[in-house]
Design a protein with these regions (language model features):
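Amphipathic, interaction-prone secondary-structure segments
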Residues: 30-59, 138-164
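Domain-length accessory/inserted modules outside core catalytic folds
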Residues: 46-47, 102, 106-117, 141-144, ...
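Intrinsically disordered, low-complexity regulatory segments enriched in Ser/Thr/Pro
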Residues: 52-78, 163-188
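Short, charged/polar micro-motifs that form catalytic or ligand-binding hotspots
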Residues: 66, 114, 118-121, 146, ...
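Short, hydrophobic/amphipathic alpha-helical patches that form generic packing surfaces
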Residues: 70-85, 192-200
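Conserved binding-pocket/active-site segment within a compact domain
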Residues: 123-183
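A recognition module on extended beta-rich or small alphabeta surfaces enriched in W/G with H and D/E
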Residues: 178-208
Length: 208
């Protein structure tokens, strides 16, 4: 996910500046109401929960108090910009089911499954659960062996379903979004969120 050359880095900086500029036309109250963030008017600051940490965003510059990955930061700004307050029905969808997700989203669904198979290889269930928990996940009962819901952004949970290895099959996993995801991020940003989750999972396993 890290950009390697200067042209691409410049493109990233332009996207960042454009995102901040759009947000500066909006009030903190409005952004909070639509995104699920908390606005502290006395400090002119937004507070956003992402994974296991609370990120403070200082208005009007939109500086943050965290050393999160730059793409995580840009996605957070895009989320604040696009959020319209739509409630979800808890129905899960794949990335390919996103609006405009047919090509990019479907490709990510396949890539994520391949990466998860490698990531989960030789990991025991307890270790997998611990890695998810360390990223702030909550667990729900489903037909999968493990279902972890990650609080990636206030109204943008990401669900990871895992089937543990048995005698016939290796461990496998799939990532899902909720059916209102299109109201909060574009398919490009959704894929970035998925990549961030995979990266964080990889780091969480390494630190156990």
């Amino acid at each position: 996910m890290e950009y390697k050359n200067q042209t691409e880095n410049r493109a990233f900086q332009e996207m960042l500046q454009a995102a901040v500029k759009r947000l500066q036309n909006r009030s903190g109250e409005d952004l909070a109401a639509k995104s699920g963030a908390v606005f502290h008017s006395s400090r002119n600051m937004l507070e956003v929960q992402s994974f296991y940490e609370t990120i403070e965003i200082q208005l009007p510059e939109f500086y943050i108090n965290s050393d999160i990955d730059e793409w995580h930061y840009l996605t957070l700004l895009h989320y604040l910009d696009m959020a319209d307050g739509t409630e979800g029905s808890q129905k899960l969808i794949t990335f390919g089911n996103l609006k405009d997700g047919l090509i990019r989203g479907t490709k990510f669904d396949r890539t994520a499954e391949q990466k998860l198979e490698k990531l989960l290889q030789d990991k025991d269930p307890e270790k997998i659960q611990k890695a998810c928990k360390n990223l702030g996940a909550e667990f729900t009962e489903t037909k999968a062996d493990l279902c972890a819901v990650f609080p990636v952004l206030p109204r943008y949970p990401v669900t990871l379903k895992i089937w543990f290895a048995d005698e016939e099959f290796p461990a496998s996993g799939k990532i899902f979004l909720q059916d209102h995801a299109d109201h909060y991020l574009s398919v490009e940003d959704a894929v970035t969120v998925g990549e961030i989750l995979l990266q964080k999972l990889s780091e969480a396993f390494s630190s156990l």
